[in-house]
Amino acid sequence: TLLLTLWKSEDDRISKTESGELGSALSMFLDKMAKDRDIVPCFNSFYEFMRDDYRAEMANRPIPIYKQDFDIDNFLTTLRQYYHGGRYDFLLNSKENIDLLNKRFVVFEVDSVKDNKELFPIVTIIIMEAFINKMRRLKGIRKMMIVEEAWKALSTANMAEYLKYMCAPVKVA
């Protein structure tokens, strides 16, 4: 969801091929990270993997992937702003490993990005992923999420669907 939100605008349709290719790329990247502990788990590393390794892997397939099915150049160009030197390179490339899982009280202040059409959906997904991680991993501990500006998150179709998707595991936990 995060990669698709970074890449596509709210109006863009996401094809099964695009979703499948990103899923395959992510699996391959995680396998590579498991084998090579020197890879820093951040967006820069994933971007370089897509640019160098995955693009080469796509070129060597017996069944070609056409640009109209999955345009890796468009993906890389669009996501360049989150890569080293881009205007949002700070967002997904933290040098610190912050443990939100074991913090008893976490506040995300989103006032500065709530009107930013590019950043707000990304920040919302990161917050929701942090919360769902707590829900799944911290068994037997009472959890609460208060969303003060929920109306803002629900104002776009993609975010409304994502919040709906995230509610199912919360009800179970």
Regions found by a protein language model. Name each.
Residues 111-173:
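Conserved P-loop NTPase motor cores
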Residues 68-110, 114-130, 161-162:
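Flexible, glycine/threonine-enriched loop-and-boundary segments that flank and lead into catalytic domains
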